[in-house]
Amino acid sequence: MQSRLSDWLVKHELVHRSLGFDYQGIETLQIKTEDWDSIAVISYIYGYNYLRSQCAYDVAPGGFLASVYHLTRIQYGIDKVEEVCLKVFVSRNNPRIPSVFWIWKSADFQERESYDMLGISYANHPHLKRILMPESWIGWPLRKDYITPNFYEIQDAR
């Protein structure tokens, strides 16, 4: 069984890989970085008009980083929405993915947080800068190979 989007991608010979279904029956698809721009636009045109969430994680120390997109197809008069999860894996040596801010505005802060915590650079994002850590912070705190700095700021508790 495949999601409707997966069926459509197969029919139009767009390469992707199914990673299975979650407990709610939502399919997760792996998308190649070089295809992400076009598949994101196709997903929107196909009706996935709402980016429910975007997050990222470090797959393994020294391994790939993943950017995850939970898309929802919301239509007036339809009680059950259709959902799909898309994952884009990138090398930690060059973690660059096209931004989807221009398709789903809700990606703005979410992509910025993924950049700030894991160092994934979202190409063509209009405000890509740190959102949680100070601009002077060195490194990416949620990477599994991150080494915590050897300093602690002592504040006066008076």
Swiss-Prot record:
Keywords: Chloroplast, Membrane, NAD, NADP, Plastid, Plastoquinone, Quinone, Thylakoid, Translocase, Transport. It is a peripheral membrane protein. The keyword Thylakoid applies. NDH shuttles electrons from NAD(P)H:plastoquinone, via FMN and iron-sulfur (Fe-S) centers, to quinones in the photosynthetic chain and possibly in a chloroplast respiratory chain. The immediate electron acceptor for the enzyme in this species is believed to be plastoquinone. Couples the redox reaction to proton translocation, and thus conserves the redox energy in a proton gradient. Transmembrane segments: none annotated. It is found in: Plastid, Chloroplast thylakoid membrane. Belongs to the complex I 30 kDa subunit family. This is NAD(P)H-quinone oxidoreductase subunit J, chloroplastic. The keyword Transport applies. GO terms for molecular function: NADH dehydrogenase (ubiquinone) activity; quinone binding. SUPFAM superfamilies: Nqo5-like (SSF143243). NDH is composed of at least 16 different subunits, 5 of which are encoded in the nucleus. GO terms for cellular component: chloroplast thylakoid membrane. It comes from the Eukaryota. One of its GO terms (biological process) is photosynthesis, light reaction. It catalyses: a plastoquinone + NADH + (n+1) H(+)(in) = a plastoquinol + NAD(+) + n H(+)(out); a plastoquinone + NADPH + (n+1) H(+)(in) = a plastoquinol + NADP(+) + n H(+)(out). Its EC number is 7.1.1.-. It comes from Dioscorea elephantipes. Gene3D superfamilies: NADH:ubiquinone oxidoreductase, 30kDa subunit.
